[in-house]
Amino acid sequence: MILKEQETLGFQSEVKQLLNLMIHSLYSNKEIFLRELISNASDAADKLRFLALAKPDLYEGNGELYVRIICNKEKRTITIIDNGIGMCRTEVIDNLGTIAKSGTKAFLETIDVKNSKNNQLIGQFGVGFYSAFIVAQKVIVRTRAAGASADEGVHWESTGEGDYIIAAINKPERGTEITLFLREGEDEFLDDWRIKNTIGKYSDHITLPIEIATNSENKNNNIITWEQINKAQALWTRNKVDVSDQEYKDFYKHLYHDSNDPISWSHNRVEGQQEYTSLLYIPASASWGIWNRDHKYGLKLYIKRVLIMDHADYFLPNYLRFVKGIIDCNDLPLNISREMLQHNRITQNLKNAITKRILSMLEKLATQNNEQYQNFWQHFGLVIKEGLAEDPNNSKSIARLLRFSTTHSKSMEQNVSLDEYVSRIAEQQEKIYYIIADSYAAANSSPHLELLQKKGIEVLLLHERIDAWMMNYLIEFNGKSFQLVSKADLKLDKFLNENTTEQKDMTKAFEPFIERVKKYLGDRIKEVRLTYSLTDTPAIVTIDSNNMTTHMAKLIVASGQNKPDIKYIFELNPLHPIVKKVSNTDNDIYFSEVIELLLDQALLVECGTLENPNQFVRRINKLLNHDTIVN
């Protein structure tokens, strides 16, 4: 190769230090160099297509555009070839001699096509080309602009050390040829399988065919044959009416290596101020890392069908981290390495739109296919519950997705929606009642439910660890506020229908007994009172509306903090035989043992444990031997 008019020029921006910083720090993984160079080649093809609309001669009789890759193991080189627009000497100096000057970006500004719906240019920064130096100790570029003569070819060469060589060459073919001379230790990229895998990961859906030489060193006839690597058509760019359900399923399985079909998907193209296409999937089951804080999640982010980020978590709130899929945008603010989003109003608007799209998709699934939604809830219900705290702007939509066990369903399965609950309540019922316990069995058999069950009032049975925390954010639904039935201020007057005069008389008669219990227990409890909300249970403990719930306190302890001090209200059932009997006794020993036992029973039901279970057992044994107490 004869070099003419050779010059050695310095880079026009911060030279060696900037190149060093960019090459060794800007990119998080080495294989990205191939993505960047293929993206540049795709841009070159798109530029040619655009300009050839007005000047067909630019095709020079060959309109079949491509990107081709040759790996030479003997010379330890990788060559990326395109037959796109190419560059003249001035463009080479401007685009390759300046860090962070993008030929694509300048092209857009020059012809003002940023608003063109058919514009497919993906380059945003001039640094993409320099990612070649991540794996290459030297890079040679041979290029010729479309429409120029063969002797107007340009040779560019650099080791990334702060300057470069530029010269004139004879190049019959238009387009650009980039040869990378690999550093020691980078021979993995000479393997065809490695190249194919990287292209499949990052550039599978570029519409330009990407081909690799299969016998570039054929010694007999020196004929190179080419194998196309990419599919060259992004499924999400097709009209959704032309894509079959099976194609959507196969694409999901290919993308995520999941053997199961997705439960649901949503394919949408949005046009307007911010144009983008999204293809969102709901998996059939949760991934192993869904509860691992370090587990990566997020959508695959494409810019003009080129994968920019494998886990663009910014577009998904944390409570929707199980959602998979892609988002393909025409333009997004990226950092200089194109590996990270720059968060601003545009990206926030996209996140809001995608979040609403997913919630709408789930609500549609719940309405149209209850069986599939129940399968979804079984795997992802706990994650959805996080959304009430994380995303208050969408709390109404999230609340509609919640499912509960209730006293009506008589099943541990969480299959009752709040809409269904509200549709069944009596007209005079102003609240949605719920109870929190450590297990379904404990919730379903709680003494706090006795009167409500007797009156046929449905109660939500909450028994998962997150529920106490969640209910701090679930305040109302369809105008109905939520009422924890273990709160002391539970108002059930409308449902009691008892003779209030009789209750008043009984309350007055029990006043001495209540005072006696208060005096005995002292400051161990907040208050002692009678309750008429029990039917089969002698006593319960409750908390007032200003106090932390028992299960919220458990969450605090589980997080490693000190146990909060909760003062319970001790409520006694005056209609229960045990309470009647102890209220009439003069035996102080019997009185103290029974009161202690009733309080321990109530605390055990409420808390699931006691501070001194051995003493509790001793009292039970002592009461079983009643003569011991009497004597």
Curated annotation (Swiss-Prot):
Entry's Gene Ontology molecular function annotations: ATP binding; ATP hydrolysis activity; ATP-dependent protein folding chaperone; unfolded protein binding
Segments for region (C) = 555-631
Q: Which top-rank group of organisms is this from? A: Bacteria
Extract the InterPro entries matched here: HATPase_C_sf, Heat_shock_protein_90_CS, HSP90_C, Hsp90_fam, Hsp90_N, Ribosomal_Su5_D2-typ_SF
Which keywords annotate this record? ATP-binding, Chaperone, Cytoplasm, Nucleotide-binding, Stress response
Which residue ranges run through the membrane? none
Question: Where does this protein reside within or beyond the cell?
Answer: Cytoplasm
Q: Where is this region: A?
A: 1-338
Supply the Pfam families for this chain: HATPase_c_3, HSP90
Transmembrane helix recorded as keyword = no
**What is the stated purpose of this protein?**
Molecular chaperone. Has ATPase activity.
Its recorded name reads Chaperone protein HtpG
This chain's source organism reads Baumannia cicadellinicola subsp. Homalodisca coagulata
Q: Which gene encodes it?
A: htpG
